[in-house]
């Protein structure tokens, strides 16, 4: 599993906006990593097997997490491969 540093404000934002607390995020990571894609501004998008997207920065600091649909996953993966365009 990746070593992700969780900040209190980022976890609070993730929970308030998307309903993901630290235990849900860790459970999503436990389900397995489906794909890792480079996003904009040196952010890394981690897609898990249960279609949760976890975004971290270049220093492995947690930024946010949210649920992704299969369609969003395909579109974002293609955008990630094209440098976010």
Regions found by a protein language model. Give the residues of each.
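Ribonuclease/tRNase effector modules and their secretory precursors
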Residues: 1-85
């Amino acid at each position: 599993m990746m070593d992700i540093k969780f900040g209190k404000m980022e976890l609070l934002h993730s929970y308030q906006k998307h309903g993901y607390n630290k235990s849900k995020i860790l459970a999503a990571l436990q389900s397995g990593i489906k794909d890792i894609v480079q996003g904009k501004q040196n952010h890394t998008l981690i897609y898990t097997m249960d279609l949760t997207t976890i975004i971290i920065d270049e220093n492995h600091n947690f930024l946010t997490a949210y649920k992704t649909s299969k369609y969003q996953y395909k579109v974002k993966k293609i955008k990630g491969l094209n440098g976010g365009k």
